[in-house]
């Protein structure tokens, strides 16, 4: 199956998208620029402009690829799933639970049945470790060691979108960093 991923937003989203790409490649799927069977949009919702960019991209992808399975994940999908549902997407994933999102995408591609899996409560106490990867087309490798926030600043939506703060255990973070360093 051919796929393409699109990322809007922060470094955490970039890291999570790279992990999804690596997982799809490991399963034997092919990354492509066009004629894709599967399209994934990892979204941001930190501003109204970000929300508009999400909607614009999702609409364009649906219009240009009416037969592709379109999956949307990330903060916009988590907080504004009703808006995302209205955009004719096939799979909506929640923040955290990327493995379930990937399985739902592949199921939707096989069965042509839409799936919505948004966890409004975001009560995941554990850190979701995603596979660390090499540099790919980048000059620096990324390693996600923390997600979420508990500060609830009046101006910030991140605690609502990503849930409470969770961290990768220190020993595991060190081991992953050493592995990335050994890979160059």
Report the location of each language-model feature:
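Proteins enriched for Cys/Gly/acidic motifs involved in redox and nucleic-acid/cofactor modification
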Residues: 1-184
């Amino acid at each position: 199956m051919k796929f393409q991923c699109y990322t809007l937003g922060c470094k955490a989203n970039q890291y999570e998208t790279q992990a999804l790409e690596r997982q799809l490649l490991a399963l034997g799927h092919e990354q492509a620029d066009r004629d894709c069977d599967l399209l994934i949009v990892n979204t941001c919702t930190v501003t109204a402009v970000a929300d508009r960019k999400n909607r614009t991209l999702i609409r364009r992808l649906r219009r240009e690829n009416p037969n592709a399975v379109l999956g949307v994940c990330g903060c916009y999908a988590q907080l504004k799933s009703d808006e995302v549902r209205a955009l004719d997407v096939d799979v909506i994933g929640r923040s955290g639970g990327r493995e379930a999102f990937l399985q739902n995408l592949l199921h939707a591609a096989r069965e042509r049945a839409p799936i919505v899996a948004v966890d409004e409560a975001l009560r995941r106490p554990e850190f979701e470790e995603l596979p660390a990867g090499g540099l790919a087309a980048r000059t620096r490798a990324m390693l996600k060691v923390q997600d979420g926030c508990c500060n609830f600043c009046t101006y910030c939506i991140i605690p609502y979108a990503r849930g409470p703060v969770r961290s990768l255990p220190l020993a595991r973070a060190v081991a992953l960093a050493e592995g990335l360093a050994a890979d160059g």
